[in-house]
Amino acid sequence: MKRLILATAVAGMFMTGAAFAADSYEIDPTHAWVGFKTNHAGWTKAHGAFKAVSGTISFDKADVTKSTVEIALEAASVDTNDEKRNTHLKSPDFLNAEEFPQITFKSTSIEKTGDKTAKVTGDLTLLGTSKPVVLDVTWNAESALPWDANTIKTGFSATGSFSGADFGIAKMADFGIGPDIALDIDVEAIKK
């Protein structure tokens, strides 16, 4: 009986350790940059960014495939360096920020591609439509803040792309932009 209790306790410790192998992080909104660019009538690439970014990361360093990420962007925070254009992008012609205030990405699978790289597949939800998007992600570094040893920060960079038409942004072609939108993401996240 004592052996059974001891075996159960040991098994419980291992199962608990496995369950808590991933560390939890919260994206630091003051150190998060989500940029995008798209063709502008063949002249150049038009650039923009979302200024309000939040999210969480569950990062399992021992088995990155068990990690998860969720990111939310406030559609009304779009910034393209021109207020008139920003207002138009927030309208029903493009992001329809009033009806769909958030753009989200939730990971569904992760494939390790190198020591610090992975392909993260997730559901991008934009204008009420969810479609899979693949991001190429690099884990940059993790360390304590130089002025606060109790605060651990980790950082990631990611790139990817999607077609605006797939999400119902039908007016892109009317304004000579797109069809693809390239993403450039850098986030720092604080360990909870």
What are these language model-derived features?
Residues 1-6:
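Bacterial N-terminal signal peptides that target proteins for export
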Residues 16-18:
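N-terminal signal peptide c-region/cleavage motif recognized by signal peptidases
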